């Protein structure tokens, strides 16, 4: 008798995988185990909750029970997996255990909080659960500091500013989105945020946070003090690999998987933000959607390697949205930038004259798909 497939996690990757499995097999036993409620919500919406006056519960799209009924699943919400015995094919919680034929780790990633004095005063917005824990404080806060000027930090800075709050956005780097693109490309967004009233503190580092009667005092390494009501850490995500380590599978930055999404153990797979696919961590929606399609086939007896095409990454800053694709972080590209009132096109060219990356903004985003077809990968 089939023991079926167990998926640990309940986020976007887990749900996409369930839907793809059920398209092909209505009966294989499917069990999902997760530490949260397993209710569905759209994680990218967290970048806009403040300006849209949304409460955490407003984000819920489908209750866990409805999901289980729709896709014929066994669900175990609010359940912490304590251990995995890979040889025995057993998953263990504190008071239960489950046997499996195939196991999928969809454990996601956790927000990195800088190890400074007062780090416990920092808030994170990496899940509906985290937002629920701090939504009152964030709604009431008038002065907000966001630490980290990457994708999420830039999105949050614009959102809080649109909600009428005083926003300070801080990063160690000399420009926003520094790990994604050079300063001459990100400067359009940087100038727009400044024009909106966001205070940018670049080439700056936080030293400590202290609770005060009026709120929180943030002290920079430069010894400058800034008084705020809330501090949000947007300093990146760390793939959740603890369970994989316990199972004895190979781990690097994420859970190491090959083109079949298979770990170093033949019956354990990983998908989503926790996975490192052939050395790459790809915490974006499109690679996860494609991964779910291929992994579903392979779990059901197929043998199809994942092939990822050139894909768009969207920066959800509504007043100046951006799409980017290719190797935008490469330092050896020559950038050709056309900036006009209706938007920007920035093309990253190799020494051989090949288009290796591009960034488009505003009305020029409609040209993204045509550029995608000419991208050298």
UniProtKB/Swiss-Prot annotation:
It comes from the Bacteria. Transmembrane segments: none annotated. It catalyses: 2 reduced [nitric oxide reductase rubredoxin domain] + NAD(+) + H(+) = 2 oxidized [nitric oxide reductase rubredoxin domain] + NADH. Keywords: Cytoplasm, FAD, Flavoprotein, NAD, Oxidoreductase. One of its GO terms (cellular component) is cytoplasm. Pathway: Nitrogen metabolism; nitric oxide reduction. InterPro entries: FAD-bd_OxRdtase, FAD/NAD-bd_sf, FAD/NAD-binding_dom, NO_rdtase_NorW, Rbx-bd. One of at least two accessory proteins for anaerobic nitric oxide (NO) reductase. Reduces the rubredoxin moiety of NO reductase. NCBIfam families: PRK04965.1. PANTHER family: NITRITE REDUCTASE [NAD(P)H], PYRIDINE NUCLEOTIDE-DISULFIDE OXIDOREDUCTASE DOMAIN-CONTAINING. Belongs to the FAD-dependent oxidoreductase family. This is Nitric oxide reductase FlRd-NAD(+) reductase. The gene is norW.
